[in-house]
Regions:
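Active-site-proximal alpha-helix that buttresses catalytic centers in soluble enzyme cores
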Residues: 1-255
Length: 255
């Protein structure tokens, strides 16, 4: 029996974001020391950009073909995605043709797969970002039109139930958007905001859409209504408790 761990991510070309991703990959690799470690990136655009810099990254089918050619029989595929959604569905579809080509091919769950995960992640993030007097903590999620996007407002509810009414969750490409939670922030009387990514990596979205100098960035939009802003450019991948959650997901599918 030859066993492999295949870590699947969307990918990023931002160096700071790659540090976040590598932290999760290292944690997963350490939790399965007897497995051959491999990685795949699902974003064709990211793979193309990396290739233009002389860096090759496998797609998911390419990585699976390589493992087959090397004689691996048992493969654990662990995504670093945050939730079920279109990207996760894509992974499921791409591994389906390989299910009977390995003795065992198992797909792990995303980070926020059930209500226990939401509560655990919120607890970890509450400890990572303690409440600051007079300051709102605003988290930027990616967002999706997939029904799984309900996770974002659910997370804000979980924070509130854990006593953190200062935490607000919005998305850059989905619902709720910043402008939909801004009235809540203003009604609560906050004049200071701490922006942090609710993203695995602090990549393009965090650097530009959240903390950028452009007028449409979240930082600029908040400053335009006389709210002072500070930003943290560290993705969830750098948080030890979040790394541990991913490792627990992996353990569910190891043999």
């Amino acid at each position: 029996m030859k066993r492999a761990l295949l870590c699947v991510s969307f990918g990023t070309t931002v160096e700071n974001g790659r540090t976040d991703l590598m932290a999760v990959e290292n944690a997963l690799q350490a939790s399965a020391p007897d497995y051959r470690f491999a990685r795949a990136l699902t974003s064709r655009i990211i793979r193309k950009r990396l290739a233009s810099r002389g860096e090759h990254a496998d797609s998911l089918p390419e990585a699976l073909e390589t493992l087959l050619a090397e004689g691996y029989t048992h493969v654990a595929v662990q995504p670093t995605h945050l939730l079920y959604g279109y990207e996760y569905d894509k992974i499921r579809a791409e591994i389906a043709p390989y299910t009977h080509r390995f003795e065992r091919l198992a797909l792990g769950r995303p980070l926020l797969a059930d209500t226990d995960d939401l509560q655990k992640a919120a607890e970890i993030l509450c400890n990572t970002y303690p409440e600051q007097n007079g300051e709102a903590l605003v988290m930027m999620g990616h967002g999706t039109e997939h029904f799984a996007g309900i996770v974002y407002p659910a997370m804000q509810s979980v924070f509130a139930l854990q006593g953190r009414s200062d935490v607000f969750v919005a998305t850059v490409e989905g619902w709720p958007a910043l402008q939909q939670i801004l009235p809540q922030i203003q009604r609560a009387g906050y004049r200071r905001v701490h922006l942090v990514p609710l993203l695995l990596v602090a990549g393009d979205h965090a650097c530009h859409d959240m903390a950028g100098a452009e007028p449409e960035s979240w930082k600029s939009q908040l400053q335009a209504v006389s709210i002072s802003v500070r930003c943290t450019l560290e993705g969830l991948g750098r948080v030890p408790g979040i790394q541990a959650m991913y490792c627990n997901k992996l353990k569910e599918i190891l043999v």
